[in-house]
């Protein structure tokens, strides 16, 4: 197994205090945030459930500022998300805007830097970490808060550069330490989770094929 299962992510997110605001892990068919007056968040896979999943993203809705946050651990642009994963979220945003805003307008803020290594399978865990930041600091979840300040972002264009691999490896180590402090579920299943989400997991899978 590689990556994180829906059950694992839901258990970790509950441990992180996101339960009341959290939609269960879902797929690219996520309808959007339809209860517009409430803080809400979700972890969404770029593929359908029948595929086994490909890549996890996190979304957060802050009704006070009418802002939708989209967190991608790789920091890909909209164009790259569509190119690599065939993932588009414009329809979800439109449904959220119609349901959540009297004037049908909202702001979108998305991550633009890379915090995850190119061969890492920890995207779902990074999303859990972001949602902890979102729930506790909903007006500044991307950075400038104690949770996300543990990570160091690098320009997305350097994702494949050997120069940034030590930084991205440290990010994954910080991620595991953070979850070990805050999630009993992670502590109980740490060995299996770290094996499935290893920093070089995708490289391991390519070699074994």
From Swiss-Prot:
Gene Ontology cellular component list: host cell nucleus; virion component
Matches recorded under InterPro entries: Papain-like_cys_pep_sf, Peptidase_C5
A molecular-function term among this protein's GO annotations: DNA binding
Keyword DNA-binding: yes
Induction: Expressed in the late phase of the viral replicative cycle.
Reaction equation(s) it catalyzes: Cleaves proteins of the adenovirus and its host cell at two consensus sites: -Yaa-Xaa-Gly-Gly-|-Xaa- and -Yaa-Xaa-Gly-Xaa-|-Gly- (in which Yaa is Met, Ile or Leu, and Xaa is any amino acid)
Activity control note: Requires DNA and protease cofactor for maximal activation. Inside nascent virions, becomes partially activated by binding to the viral DNA, allowing it to cleave the cofactor that binds to the protease and fully activates it. Actin, like the viral protease cofactor, seems to act as a cofactor in the cleavage of cytokeratin 18 and of actin itself.
Active-site residues, Swiss-Prot/TrEMBL: 55, 72, 123
Entry EC no(s): 3.4.22.39
Site feature: Cleavage: 52-53
Pfam family, one: Peptidase_C5
One GO BP: proteolysis
Keywords linked to the UniProt accession: Autocatalytic cleavage, Disulfide bond, DNA-binding, Host nucleus, Hydrolase, Late protein, Protease, Thiol protease, Virion
Main location: virion
SUPFAM superfamilies in alphabetical order: Cysteine proteinases
Keyword hit for Methyltransferase: no
Compartmental location: Virion; Host nucleus
Free-text function comment from the UniProt entry: Cleaves viral precursor proteins (pTP, pIIIa, pVI, pVII, pVIII, and pX) inside newly assembled particles giving rise to mature virions. Protease complexed to its cofactor slides along the viral DNA to specifically locate and cleave the viral precursors. Mature virions have a weakened organization compared to the unmature virions, thereby facilitating subsequent uncoating. Without maturation, the particle lacks infectivity and is unable to uncoat. Late in adenovirus infection, in the cytoplasm, may participate in the cytoskeleton destruction. Cleaves host cell cytoskeletal keratins K7 and K18.
Misc note: All late proteins expressed from the major late promoter are produced by alternative splicing and alternative polyadenylation of the same gene giving rise to non-overlapping ORFs. A leader sequence is present in the N-terminus of all these mRNAs and is recognized by the viral shutoff protein to provide expression although conventional translation via ribosome scanning from the cap has been shut off in the host cell.
Entry similarity comment: Belongs to the peptidase C5 family.
Subunit structure: Interacts with protease cofactor pVI-C; this interaction is necessary for protease activation.
Protein name: Protease
Taxonomic lineage: Viruses, Varidnaviria, Bamfordvirae, Preplasmiviricota, Tectiliviricetes
